[in-house]
Amino acid sequence: MWFQLKIEHCPNDKIEEITEELEEYGALSITLTDKNDNPVLEPEPGTTPLWPEVIIHALFAQAEEAQYVREQLVAKRPSLHCSLELLADKNWERAWMDDFRPQRFGNRLWVCPTWLPPPEPDAVNLMLDPGLAFGTGTHATTSLCLTWLEQADLKNKSIIDYGCGSGILSLAAIKLGAKHVYAVDIDNQALQATQSNAHANHITESQLSISTPEALQNPVHLIIANILLAPLISLKERFHQLLPSGAHLVTSGILEEQAPLLIDAYDSAFTHIATEYCEGWSLLVFTSK
């Protein structure tokens, strides 16, 4: 049996401090999850990539141990809401695994958890383990990007996946025919997740490069960026340098009402050619001028 301590109402600027304390108290595992099922999108430089409302889960072997940690945390931070849950063996793994089911995007692309067989073995199947980082296709922004990629002609194209997260867009692009993808992120955990998922899908170094954004040098046919509005605007000139005239830029990670702001900000360097919406989020397609 296992005992899970669930910590809510935790200010983002205290999360690192609390997770360090949990490690000192001997937590067997510590997991951060999103209260509202939002994705972790590329933050502005110098900020920590966290959801607006984070829940911390800490696993302990003894009830007394978990209760003691709960009391210590609440005594120091009365605003925290801490609850205990008894978990049967392996339920702590199954809890999130059961929620991740195979999903289809477009006509031929499936995103499947690594522990389940693909529903259509002959389809384009991307095997994904989201436990290491973020991005499973369940959020509207990721779904918009995957659907666009599935419908696009990616054969022999070079692509930058800016803010790669779990690597889901990079790997999908390769599975759909891209010649080479540059997966970049400012978060080392995201780069590690992308590498792990690439290995699970038998993706080679000749198909995928994984790095921080500073390593980008070569122009590409397409950039796809599922990141927030502020970094998207700040990256306009950088994207323009990496895209020859007529090349495509696909952006998501922005709300419907933010779309006009990005279109206006990009007008000097890019031509807006298409927009898709899903659950209040938007995907914008541009060509480089």
Swiss-Prot record:
An individual GO BP term: methylation
Keywords: Cytoplasm, Methyltransferase, S-adenosyl-L-methionine, Transferase
EC number of this enzyme: 2.1.1.-
InterPro entries: Ribosomal_L11_MeTrfase_PrmA, Ribosomal_PrmA_MeTrfase, SAM-dependent_MTases_sf
Single annotated GO MF: protein-lysine N-methyltransferase activity
Annotated catalysed reactions: L-lysyl-[protein] + 3 S-adenosyl-L-methionine = N(6),N(6),N(6)-trimethyl-L-lysyl-[protein] + 3 S-adenosyl-L-homocysteine + 3 H(+)
Subcellular location: Cytoplasm
Major site of localization recorded for this protein: cytoplasm
Highest taxon of the lineage: Bacteria
Pfam family, one: PrmA
GO CC field: cytosol
Binding of S-adenosyl-L-methionine, residues: 142, 163, 185, 226
Family statement: Belongs to the methyltransferase superfamily. PrmA family.
Record function comment: Methylates ribosomal protein L11.
Name of the protein described by the UniProt record: Ribosomal protein L11 methyltransferase
